[in-house]
Amino acid sequence: MANKKEYVVGIDLGTTNSVIAWMKPDSSVEVIPNAEGARTTPSIVAFSKTGEILVGEPAKRQLILNSERTIKSIKRKMGTDYKVKIDDKDYTPQEISAFILKKLKRDAEEYLGGEVKKAVITCPAYFNDAQRQATKEAGIIAGFEVLRIINEPTAAALAYGLDKKGKEEKVLVYDLGGGTFDVSILEIGDGVIQVVATSGNNHLGGDDFDQRIIDWLAEEFKKQHGVDLREDKQALQRLRDAAEKAKIELSSKLETDISLPYITATAEGPLHLEMRLTRSMFESLTRDLVEMTRKPVEQALSDAKLKPEDIDEIILVGGMTRVPMVQKFIKEIFGKDPNRGVNPDEAVAVGAAIQAAILAGEEGAQGKDIVLVDVTPLTLGIEVKGGLFEPIIPRNSTIPIKKSKVFTTAEDGQTEVEVRVYQGERPIAADNILLGSFRLVGIPPAPRGVPQIEVTFDIDSDGIVHVSAKDLGTGKEQSMVVSGRHQLSEDDINKIIEDAKKFEEQDKRRKEEVELKNKADDLAYYIEKSLKEYGDKIPADEKDKLENLVKDLRDAINKNDIPRIKMLFDELDREKTKIGEYIYKQNQQGGNQQAENQ
């Protein structure tokens, strides 16, 4: 029996819907329909009472009757310790996501008549390390060899950017999906797609627009009948489906009728919901949600040091960008219409398929030399003496990237160091987010400042962070992969960046104070060491003076008395030159004495 042909795919694993695509030998990209014949698959998993696992449209169809055993928007929980409990079994977000990926894989294999093994899977640009790891794990559980995890906006730009060879452009990707909003600014040209800035909101998307319609319908119905449909799970699910349908219809129509017969019943009999929703009413219900995308857009422009008029193209991703009010809002900011040449629902999967074909060296990708360059959303570094944050990889650095810095010990005879890894923009480590820590042990005892410890940060092409510390004297090394299960949303990241700006003056002062204390401690250490070595060459009164100054300085450091530290540091700094004078004077006298004796 002949071996089955192997196919390479790109997958958009979305909050609301997922899409799978492949590149044909003629270089065109085809979105693969699922078993139900649709080009998008709802990211929904259900466990039926009989133990059957339903995924996609079948799961969505029975959501009303089985809402407690149906999981949607699991992507929001990726990278956390969240568990779904069904029949005494706990499922991780990776396992639930793997059910979705397995269905995509199975349906693609059926459609293509071969094996689908290798895949590029996308995630939001703002997914942190733990969330990216979880996405990769979901792919592995589903039976894929995950070639790479790439950012959704980067993938969309790739779908768009192939036709733009030879022309340098600044492109803004506005991605408003079912559960997340991402905005990215990219530079495209000469076969390179570089992300220069990213921003967004991890909890803003189509679900929120649906909720506004649900609340409006429920409130209107309550006024008419005195019944709140949101308290009845089945009625609420029917409202949710109707709201989504109405929202979609209002992108092409000015009004839509919502009819839900037998939505509930009272003692008097059954009740029916019949309402008309106009586009203008929908816009007034959701205008503030669209407005919430303004700040991330401005943040991305600010990070890229660009003005709206510097953007050559705006491309839309996510079904929500079909909403006329969203397109009008974008035109108001940029003074130009967004490019509609990319299907917003499929662009990400198409880009992922192109990248997959390039990485796997597929026939259709021959001659397509595309380089994707992603960036780190926040600065990465470690805690150093005095609790300061020492950046190693700055925010918005292109990845993959590897950077090292050499550090030393803070105490005499220190035989181990703790490497504490942080992410953030503040100069004091404790004000940033601790990603994890590890210890490097077995450092040979030596005076402080002598050992050489090289700390290396290595971010791979999936955005996963590897940190290592190496004692350059012994070659001993310790490392870790940052996989702390903390969820850092886009809101959190934007807040971190805003806080850094807000506390800039205060942080600058605190940093200067810590640096002064560190310098004072180093000076006190130097004087003590010098007095030990050369004390016999220094007059007793001068030696006493220096010892008292060191004692007072250490006391001021312990009490955090900044003005006194500064005063004593300056005085001790002036006095330290006398040590050298006395040493050289003694040596000269000794030398002259020797010359006379000869």
UniProtKB/Swiss-Prot annotation:
Induction of the gene: By stress conditions e.g. heat shock.
Signal peptide, first to last residue: none
Pfam families the UniProt entry points to: HSP70
GO molecular function, one term: ATP-dependent protein folding chaperone
Top-level taxon of origin: Bacteria
S-S bridge residues: none
Coiled coil feature spans: none
Key words of the record: ATP-binding, Chaperone, Nucleotide-binding, Phosphoprotein, Stress response
InterPro entries hit by this protein: ATPase_NBD, Chaperone_DnaK, Heat_shock_70_CS, HSP70_C_sf, HSP70_peptide-bd_sf, Hsp_70_fam
Protein role: Acts as a chaperone.
Record-stated family: Belongs to the heat shock protein 70 family.
Protein name: Chaperone protein DnaK
